[in-house]
Amino acid sequence: MAHSAEPSSSLSFTSSPHLSNGSISHNLSCSGSESVPSLEVISLSKLSSSLEQLLIDPGCDYSDADIVVEGIPVGVHRCILASRSGFFRELFKREKGSSGKEDRPKYCMSDFLPYGDVGYEAFLVFLSYVYTGKLKPSPVEVSTCVHNVCAHDACRPAINFVVELMYAASIFQMPDLVSIFERRLLNFVGKALSDNVVPILLVAFHCQLNQLIDQCVDRVARSDIDDISLEKGLPDEVVKKIKILRRNYQQDSDPNLPPADPLHEKRIRRIHKALDSDDVELVKLLLTESNITLDEANALHYAAAYCDPKVVTEVLALGLADVNLRNSRGYTALHIAVMRKEPSIIVLLLTKGARASELTSDGQSAVSICRRLTRPKDYHSKTEQGQEANKDRICIDVLEREMRRNPMAGDASISSQIMPDDLHMELLNLENRVALARLFFPAEAKLAMVIAHAETSEFAAPSSSKGSSGNLMEVDLNETPTVQNKRLHSRLEALMKTVRLGRCYFPHCSEVLDKFIDDDLPHLFYLEPGSSDEQKVKRRRFMELKEEVQKAFDKDKAECNLSGLSSSSSTTSPEKIGANQKVREP
């Protein structure tokens, strides 16, 4: 299994039939009858261990070049890489790379890859094999998912990690590793979901692994993956093979199966092309000219899978699509959006009535799909204050909260009942609240604002001449009172919807903001003027407030961990905030 904690494998790989998802056999015996390794094997093992120290021991850092992977420099020894890899041998002959620290060459991983991707952890596993001849187990944090009942033997993160290793082995010209990973990918093909076979087929095509291509093409041709998904995710040459094989299988199973209506298919594809062009007006025109409906074209599914969130908003605004409609594979638009892992589209669909409890034909909910696609590294990643939270984590949080609550009630407009003076005060309060949310929880605030169609200026104290709402309150001599009142009410409703969305999907963040605004914000206003001593008190108090935000988040996170549920991760680390005890002002 990918996360098994076992020793590294032996120096000989190709003869070992015992392949697992994360490591291979490490028996040093030359035959079953020998109980003691030979002196030669012991010497090679010691050499391997000594070379490994060059990678793992900080005291043995004698590297002479850096390869930057995902923004992280990895020190390497060019002589070792050149002796083991024809790719690096030719690279170091041809160029010296850009100058780094102490004039050592620096290379960027993305410059090496004509296709595919090789992540930081995958490169470290590859590098360890180059140095030691031993293949390490796959790191748990990048080769498993966060679904609590998954065996991790063929989930998407497990497959993706081996795919990355295959790209590294093929591009860097390590044929023995290619053979190992090809067998491992072949093992995946029979166990994985059909959608998860697509990345395997793609790497097989790029690396010209014919046996693996044939196995994948056969598996995909027998699946229910639609032609559009294939055309979007695979090269034309491969798609053509799949379609031919699929037609043959269909004719064998049902010779009387009527062919698809080409005119009907053409009209549907025209609607999809209009969505690709972000032209919803053209979509409306095509619907008028033909007898095709949005649901027949699965337009909402298509937009959720491939289009900008603004296009999804416009399609929903037409009011012609069933938000819980299932496509031919039994997926709703929410299931498709979850596979894409786009939080804004997920929240859009939920606010329009999409049911998170809907199950696919194989019994998976939206949150189950999302968890099977998410790596522990991404789910548990820590985010500094002011940085955006990980999208995978936000998607899971939103869906789990939706599963635990009643569907959100419709937006009842109460802004029309607010008097003019109260309207300005309410606008000021909401503008400042949303601005504070952007400061403390930027990713969550941005998501709520996008759905509510709200934009706000940065937070400013009431001493500002224009207020925190910027030009919103300014008097326009060309604007009639009626128009101004309509504009302010529209703004108020957008801000109120932003706050409601925050309370609905990010309740812990909202609680922190409530406490900050009720208990602490007035004190900051009173301290705005004053002597230097008062300014020092204000700065000290602000640091204490930052600590309270962290403590509140840690408390929520601990409670969620105990119950197996998750909370928002957009905050800063306690080490960078300061003391652990909050001092109340007298």
UniProtKB/Swiss-Prot annotation:
Primary localization class, coarse: cytoplasm
InterPro entries assigned: Ankyrin_rpt, Ankyrin_rpt-contain_sf, BTB/POZ_dom, NPR, NPR1/NIM1-like_C, NPR_central_dom, SKP1/BTB/POZ_sf
Annotated region (Disordered), positions in chain: 561-586
Ranges for the ANK repeats: 266-296, 298-325, 329-358
UniProt keyword terms in alphabetical order: ANK repeat, Cytoplasm, Metal-binding, Nucleus, Plant defense, Repeat, Stress response, Ubl conjugation pathway, Zinc, Zinc-finger
Any one annotated GO CC term: nuclear body
Source organism superkingdom: Eukaryota
Subcellular location field: Cytoplasm; Nucleus; Nucleus, Nuclear body
Induction behaviour: Induced by salicylic acid (SA) in roots, stems and leaves. Induced by jasmonate in roots. Induced by ethylene in roots and leaves. Induced by salt stress, osmotic shock, cold stress and abscisic acid (ABA).
Pathway info: Protein modification; protein ubiquitination
Residue ranges constituting the BTB domain according to the UniProt record: 63-139
Residue numbers spanned by region Salicylic acid-binding core (SBC): 388-522
Binding site for salicylate: 433
Record-level GO BP terms: defense response; defense response to bacterium; defense response to fungus; regulation of jasmonic acid mediated signaling pathway; regulation of salicylic acid mediated signaling pathway; response to salt stress; response to water deprivation; systemic acquired resistance, salicylic acid mediated signaling pathway
The keyword Cytoplasm is assigned to this record: yes
Binding annotation for Zn(2+): 145, 150, 152, 155
Compositionally biased region (Low complexity): 562-573
Pfam families assigned: Ank_4 (PF13637), BTB (PF00651), DUF3420 (PF11900), NPR1_like_C (PF12313)
Zn finger region (C2HC NPR-type): 142-156
Molecular function GO terms recorded: zinc ion binding
Known function: Salicylic acid (SA)-binding substrate-specific adapter of an E3 ubiquitin-protein ligase complex (CUL3-RBX1-BTB) which mediates the ubiquitination and subsequent proteasomal degradation of target proteins.
Family statement: Belongs to the plant 'ANKYRIN-BTB/POZ' family. 'NPR1-like' subfamily.
PANTHER family documented for this protein: REGULATORY PROTEIN NPR3
Domain notes: The BTB/POZ domain mediates the interaction with some component of ubiquitin ligase complexes.
Name the record gives this protein: BTB/POZ domain and ankyrin repeat-containing protein NPR1
Natural source organism: Malus hupehensis (Chinese crab apple)
